[in-house]
Regions:
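Noncatalytic, helix-rich "gating/capping" subdomain that lines the substrate-entry/channel surface
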Residues: 1-172
Length: 172
C-alpha cells in the first residue's frame, strides 16, 4: 500500500513538471530497481549495531577488484596523495555486489534516482501546487490530513536560513 502511495504521489509531482507518463513510469521503475538491489545487500539495523562484525580489512589490490569500473587509484591519489595499503570495509555484502551499482548497466538506475532527487530539492521554492504535491506522501505517512497553509509554509521557508540566529536572539 505504501509503495503504491509513493508511486501515485511521485507520479503526480512529476506530472506537474511536465514529465510524460512514459518518462514517469520509467523513472519510477528504475528507482525501485535500484532500491531492490540496495535492499538485497545493505546491512540491517541489527547487523549494523554489531560493530565487531563490521571490521573486514582488505588489501587494497583485492578491494579494487570489487569495483573495477571505479577509478580508485585516481581518487585516492587526488584525496590523500597515495593509494592505501588496506581498506576497511564495513558493508562487505555491498562491496561484494558492487558491480550491480558501479557499472554502465547501473547508470540509468542512478540517473533516475538523481532526477527524482533534484525534482524534490526545489519543490518548496516553486508553485504552491508543487509544494502541496511534494508533501503528499509524507503527509500520508504521518497521518496529516492536509498540507500546511501556504502563508505558514512561506513563513517557514523564509525563516529557515535564520532559524538558529532567531533562536539565539530569542533565548537571550
Amino acid at each position: 500500500e505504501l509503495l503504491n502511495l509513493w508511486k501515485e504521489s511521485t507520479s503526480n509531482l512529476l506530472k506537474a513538471y511536465n514529465f510524460s507518463d512514459e518518462e514517469i513510469e520509467d523513472l519510477l521503475e528504475k528507482r525501485l530497481e535500484l532500491d531492490r538491489r540496495i535492499a538485497a545487500v545493505v546491512l540491517s539495523n541489527e547487523e549494523s549495531s554489531e560493530y565487531a562484525k563490521l571490521y573486514h580489512p582488505y588489501a587494497y589490490e583485492d578491494f579494487k577488484k570489487f569495483a573495477p569500473a571505479l577509478p580508485l587509484d585516481d581518487f585516492f591519489q587526488a584525496v590523500i596523495g597515495q593509494t592505501p595499503d588496506k581498506v576497511i570495509v564495513d558493508e562487505e555484502r555491498f562491496w561484494q555486489a558492487a558491480d550491480q551499482f558501479y557499472s554502465e548497466e547501473a547508470w540509468p538506475l542512478f540517473k533516475a534516482t538523481l532526477i527524482l532527487g533534484v525534482v524534490n530539492l526545489s519543490t518548496s521554492y516553486l508553485t504552491d501546487e508543487i509544494r502541496v504535491l511534494s508533501g503528499a506522501y509524507g503527509r500520508a505517512l504521518s497521518g496529516v490530513p492536509e498540507a500546511q497553509d501556504k502563508v505558514k509554509a512561506a513563513y517557514h521557508l523564509a525563516q529557515g536560513p535564520f532559524k538558529q540566529a532567531l533562536g539565539l536572539w530569542y533565548a537571550h
